[in-house]
């Protein structure tokens, strides 16, 4: 589902930013992969190689997660000063760019725009910020009309043939906070269509938050899957089972 939702967004956003997707049609993959068709169908992409920036590009439209925690302590998020008196889950006056490091293991670490520029340069930082906020704004407007608030999300970018392109995944429940619009109310944590359900379950356990993580009960896995599939349906207008037929249709048009 994550792969298929990314494919949907890559297509939707292609007028805003180029991406690394070549095809999701396994029949068009290199010949040596044909014997793995059953395993690859619907859950893989053939992508272009890119030199990836070592930065997670986060866009926040609402105050939640690590941003909310940092705001409570400093009144800022990643060096961005915010108005006083905001509540958890409040909509921000405007979306903000809050980059983070790409950790090899453990959690990513929030950094400022200045620290980002020190790592990758002023011009690259300016362009990544511009792309991140443009993508977020377009996707958030689309999702809002379909009953989903994209509270925040993160992107990765790379360089191919001198052009900055989007890579990895795009606007999935793993990389974003998706809230149902009909139940949204600031001042508390929100119901969600993302991995927050798993986070909330893990918070009930006596666990030091170091790998390996505890096993998840089947009930938590099943409920998380339901939430992810509902997000996919609302955003794309299709069930996950429709993917194969729509891919076939796209090859004949």
List the predicted regions and their residue ranges:
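C-terminal helix-cap and adjacent tail motif
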Residues: 170-231
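Conserved metal-phosphate-binding beta-hairpin within the catalytic cores
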Residues: 151-170
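Active-site loop/lid in soluble adenylation, ligation, and acyl-transfer enzymes
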Residues: 1-100, 208-215, 219-247, 253
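Short, charged/polar surface micro-motifs in flexible loops or helix N-caps
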Residues: 64-66, 163-164, 172-173
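A short mid-domain helix/strand-loop element embedded in enzyme catalytic domains
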Residues: 89-122
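Generic recognition of stable, solvent-exposed alpha-helical segments in well-folded globular domains
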Residues: 4, 123, 127-134, 193, ...
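A long amphipathic alpha-helix within ATP-dependent nucleotide-binding catalytic cores
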Residues: 120-151
């Amino acid at each position: 589902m994550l792969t298929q939702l990314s494919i949907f967004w890559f297509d939707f956003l292609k007028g805003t930013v180029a991406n690394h997707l070549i095809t999701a049609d396994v029949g068009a993959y290199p010949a040596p992969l044909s014997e793995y068709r059953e395993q690859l169908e619907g859950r893989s992409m053939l992508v272009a190689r890119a030199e990836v920036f070592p930065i997670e590009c986060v866009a926040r439209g609402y105050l939640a997660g690590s941003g909310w925690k940092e705001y409570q302590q400093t009144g800022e998020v990643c060096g961005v000063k915010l108005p006083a008196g905001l509540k958890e889950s409040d909509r921000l006056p405007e979306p903000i760019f809050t980059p983070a490091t790409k950790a090899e293991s453990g959690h990513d670490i929030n950094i400022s725009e200045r620290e980002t520029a020190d790592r990758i340069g002023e011009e690259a930082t300016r362009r990544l910020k511009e792309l991140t906020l443009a993508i977020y704004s377009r996707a958030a407007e689309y999702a809002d009309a379909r009953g989903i608030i994209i509270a925040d999300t993160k992107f990765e970018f790379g360089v191919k043939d001198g052009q900055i392109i989007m890579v990895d995944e795009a606007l999935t429940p793993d990389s974003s906070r998706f809230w149902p619009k009909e139940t949204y109310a600031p001042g508390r944590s929100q119901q969600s269509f993302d991995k927050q359900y798993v986070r909330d379950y893990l918070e009930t356990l006596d666990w030091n938050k170091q790998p390996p993580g505890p096993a998840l009960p089947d009930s938590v896995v099943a409920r998380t899957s339901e939430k992810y599939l509902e997000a996919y349906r609302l955003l794309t207008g299709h069930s996950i089972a429709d993917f194969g037929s729509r891919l076939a249709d796209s090859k004949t048009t």
